[in-house]
Amino acid sequence: MVIITILLILFQLNKVFADNIQLPDSHAPISVMGDHTHKKKEVMFSYRFMNMQMGKLFNNNKKLSKDAVMSAPNGASDGSGSYMNTPKSMSMDMHMFGMMYAPSNRITLMLMNSFLEKEMTQQRMRMAGGANFDVNSSGFGDLKASALITLLNETNWENSFLLGVSLPTGSIDKRGRTPASNNTRLGYGMQNGTGTYDTYFLINNLNTIDKFKIGEQIHF
């Protein structure tokens, strides 16, 4: 009975103080990038970690078997040959570093880069024995620079857009040991960079309705 009474008291205390709880809702979930702006001269540094595990092959939304991949025409040989290897699984650890600085209340500048650690297990074609082998790569990816511009900053409605460019600072010549050679240039998925300049654009919208916040982010 004493335990029940104590639990009831704690429950009542939680109800009393519930209206004064400070919620961490000034930022979107950690996987959402470029969601908020800063006040003039504010600086923020960030670190995010993400792990990805991949193990299936698709052509659009159609799942492919490993035999189907290795029997498909190889574009590198003008379609006259087939693929000698196929991916079986891949893991990637991504360490993301970011910095934000606001030169004014309306504009927030952003820099982002990532350190990537990749490992892929591949399978040889049956005529070559069908054995598995692993390839690895690591290094920094492409540098992203962007500007986040506030369009609207009202009590119940916030709106902003981001313009950014991706600079090809990541390596596209990672090499490793494979059954073919001890210094083979690895496939596109194992490279750290894209080798191209790319632009990107997104729009943020945040509405506050009573105690609820609803946000959307659209990428282009």
Predicted segments with their positions:
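Short, surface-exposed, charged loop/turn segments at secondary-structure junctions
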Residues: 177-183, 220
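Generic cytosolic/nucleocytoplasmic N-terminal low-complexity/intrinsically disordered segments
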Residues: 13-14, 143, 210
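Cleavable N-terminal export/targeting peptides
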Residues: 1-26
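Short, glycine/charged-enriched secondary-structure capping and boundary segments
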Residues: 125-126, 176-178
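A short secondary-structure junction signal
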Residues: 172-177, 215-217
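Aromatic-anchored, glycine/proline-accented short structural segments
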Residues: 197-220
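Transmembrane beta-barrel domains of Gram-negative outer membranes and organellar outer membranes
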Residues: 19-158, 164-167, 185-193, 198-201
